[in-house]
Design a protein with these regions (language model features):
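Ribonuclease/tRNase effector modules and their secretory precursors
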Residues: 1-91
Length: 91
């Protein structure tokens, strides 16, 4: 099933400036069949964190919220840290 994915343009610019990762490129992580996803309980809203591969083969960490079962708003994306890469590769 195709997800509807959105992000705020200003937030996407800040994310690229800070992490050098485009939110538009990070969408592919959500379609990675072996991605690792956990709930992030550190926030008021229910957030999810997924470690997976983007379209260029780079391992990314993507944070997002569900607006409904098929509608996602991306919050941030960054390159995986070494320990996150090991976690992903061991999955």
């Amino acid at each position: 099933m195709k997800l509807r994915i959105q992000f705020n343009a200003a937030k996407a610019t800040r994310n690229f400036t800070k992490h050098r990762v485009r939110l538009a490129d990070a969408e592919a992580v959500l379609y990675d069949p072996i991605a690792l996803t956990v709930e992030d309980n550190d926030h008021d809203e229910q957030r999810w964190v997924t470690i997976g591969v983007d379209g260029s083969g780079q391992i990314l960490v993507v944070v997002y919220v569900y607006r409904d079962p098929n509608f996602i708003r991306l919050i941030s994306a960054r390159k995986a840290q070494p320990q996150e890469t090991i976690q992903y590769q061991g999955a």
